[in-house]
Every structure is written in C-alpha cells, then in structure tokens.
C-alpha cells in the first residue's frame, strides 16, 4: 500500500511538471533582443555606445519588472565588423539560433541594407540606431519590418543643405563621399536638397575605405572653387580627410554627416579636428531633462564616464536608449514576442513615451518608419577632442 501511494505521488508530480513546465518556462524565460554592430575595428566606439544605451534601458526596464508579466530583457551582442556578408550571417544566427524578438542595428548602412531582406524573410523587427541610409526604412517592403530611431540621409541632407546656405552662407559646396551605398544615398540627397536651395556642387569626389590620402580629391575641389567641403565619412576615412586638408594647406570649413563621431576621429587627428562641424540627434552638454540626468548617472556608475565630455559617440547611446524603450513598449502592447505582432504594435504605439531625445507620440505608422526627422537634429563641433554644441 505504501509503495502504491509512493508511486502515485511520483506520477502526479511528474504529470504536473509535464503539464505546467513549458508554460512556466515560457513565462519566466528572458526576452532576448539582438544587437548587430561594429564593436571592433575603426568604428568600435559606435558599437560600444549603442550597447551602453541598450543596456541602460534594459536594466531600467528589468528593475521595474521586465515585460510580459515579469520576463526580463536580455541583450545578445554580435560583432558584424562593418562587413555586410557577416551581417547577413549574424542576422540569421540571432533570429534562428538565439530566437531574439527584435534586432538593433549599428553604424554601417552597407550592413543594414544587406540585412533588410533577412528581417522580412524571418519576420523579425529591425530597429536602426545609427545607420542612416534612406533605403533602410524606405525599402519598398509591405509589410515593412525595418524601423529606425536615428537619422535618415534624406532628412540629414536637407538639414545640411539648409545649414550650409542659410547659416554658413556658403554657395559653392564640394561633396566628398565614401564610395559605398551610404555615400550614394547622400549624393542623391545632397544634390536634391542643395538644388532646392538653388545651389549646385562645384565637384563630387569619392574615396574608398582605408584610402591613406585624400589630397587629390581635395585639390580638385579646391581648384573647382569650393568654399565648403560637405563630408560623408566614418571616423577612419574622415581623419584622413582632415589630415589631407592640412597637408594641402587649405583652410576650407568642413560640414559633415555624423559618421566621424563613431570612432577614433579626434584621437587620430588631434587639433586638426577643431572646427569640424556635424549633425547629432542629442547632446549630453547643457541643461538635461530628468531622463538625461538619469542616463548620465548610469553612464557614470556602469561605465566610469565622468561627464558629458567623456560620453563616446553620444548619438549611439541616446538613439539606442530611446529605441529600446519603444521596442519594449511594442512587446507589451502586442502581449507577445511574435515578430509580426511586435511589428504591428510598433506601427500603432499607444500613448506617449517621453524619451531622451524627445517625446514620442505614435512615432511610426505604416508609411513612416523613422521616428526622428530633421526637426530633431542639432549641430555640434569638435573642440579640443570633445563634441560640443554649436553656439
């Protein structure tokens, strides 16, 4: 009799575990979110900045109970090295092996564009936090799985054209662009928006990644009469441009896209970087909102950042922080980690989220997958190796 009761107890316990085990596991398992970014090489600062913003937001949400009734968020980081082919492999790995609910993207437009077909095939939301290529979000897909809390080249080019002509009073720009899909995206936008101001570039020059000297391109722009160089480059090549400008003895002002802030630009150029002006979406200098103060405090406690002048690649952190919160809100609204449901929720987020960069009220729609526009950009300048707002 005792033996029978003992066996019956074991059977009942086993039955209970079988019946409730998967459900309990599903309820308590962390919700994984992926990051595909360059966390090594010349643009590693961008990847590190993005990772910091994501982790600060994740810790904040987890401290308040997580999502979906208590599930913690967990970040899975993969280094795409700015390599499109590796980015595609990573995209599949994050979704198929790691089973992430969404993926955040890094600095390189070339990588992001290569990954776009994968997100749509696997029905996984992508949230850009840096790469600005226009066609990342305007990709012609319906439904569209690519979203962004970052700059969009089309908006950036409009902003730069207006700043150059209205603020700097320059009417003879020369474009110096990297020879990639990102450079091509900006060539189209800059030509369009400067044209809208009644201005035509005196020359359009290209360079390849790792080119050691930009003197020939700069001399051609100088001889063409350029009174401003509009630069589209990441940190390694941007540094070569600034060094080459000094080499040819040309004191022309440089107005740049923000790629130069994603690496060791100031370290590689020293005082030569002073005065180079470029766009950002956020600055940790000046009076901060309560959320800005919180993020700075977390940067200090978690990463040893002593002040705004030590915040590396600040837009990476700011964009990623806001982007993570919007994705978490979408997961909560969808009541699911299913990619299609999260995507639908992103397009119809309820209420308002007061973020670091701005207050977001329905930041995405079926036709608009960029949460930020040119109304959200600011101009900054390199001074003494630090990024400070233009006065």
Tell me what each language-model feature is.
Residues 2-17, 24-391:
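Extracytosolic ligand-binding ectodomains
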């Amino acid at each position: 009799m005792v033996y029978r009761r003992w066996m019956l107890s074991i059977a009942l316990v086993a039955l209970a575990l079988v019946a409730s085990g998967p459900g309990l596991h599903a309820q308590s398992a962390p919700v994984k979110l992926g990051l595909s970014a360059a966390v090594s090489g010349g643009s590693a600062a961008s990847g590190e900045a993005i990772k910091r913003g994501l982790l600060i937001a994740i810790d904040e949400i987890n401290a308040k109970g997580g999502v979906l009734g208590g599930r913690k968020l967990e970040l899975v980081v993969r280094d795409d090295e700015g390599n499109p082919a590796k980015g595609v492999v990573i995209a599949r790995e994050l979704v198929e092996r790691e089973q992430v609910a969404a993926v955040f993207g890094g600095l390189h437009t070339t990588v992001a564009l290569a990954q776009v077909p994968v997100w749509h095939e696997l029905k996984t939301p992508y949230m850009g936090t840096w790469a600005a290529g226009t066609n990342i979000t305007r990709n012609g897909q319906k439904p569209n799985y690519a979203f962004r809390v970052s700059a969009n080249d089309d908006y950036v080019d409009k902003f730069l054209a207006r700043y150059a002509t209205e603020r700097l009073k320059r009417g003879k720009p020369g474009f110096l662009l990297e020879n990639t899909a990102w450079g091509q995206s900006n060539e189209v936008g800059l030509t369009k928006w400067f044209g809208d101001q009644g201005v035509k570039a005196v020359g359009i020059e290209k360079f390849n990644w790792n080119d050691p000297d930009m003197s020939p391109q700069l001399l051609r722009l100088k001889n063409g009469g350029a009174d401003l160089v509009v630069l589209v480059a990441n940190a390694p090549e941007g540094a070569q441009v600034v060094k080459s400008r000094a080499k040819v003895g040309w004191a022309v002002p440089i107005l740049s896209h923000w790629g130069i802030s994603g690496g060791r630009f100031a370290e590689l150029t020293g005082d030569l970087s002073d005065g180079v002006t470029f766009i950002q979406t956020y600055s940790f200098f000046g009076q901060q909102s309560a959320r800005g103060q919180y993020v700075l405090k977390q940067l200090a406690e978690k990463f040893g950042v002593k002040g705004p002048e030590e915040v590396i690649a600040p837009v990476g952190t700011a964009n990623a922080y806001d982007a993570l919160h919007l994705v978490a809100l979408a997961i909560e609204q969808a009541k699911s980690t299913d990619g299609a449901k999260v995507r639908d929720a992103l397009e119809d987020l309820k209420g308002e989220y007061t973020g670091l960069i701005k207050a977001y009220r329905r930041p995405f729609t079926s036709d608009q997958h960029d949460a930020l526009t040119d109304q959200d950009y600011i101009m900054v300048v390199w001074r003494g190796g630090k990024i400070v707002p233009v006065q």
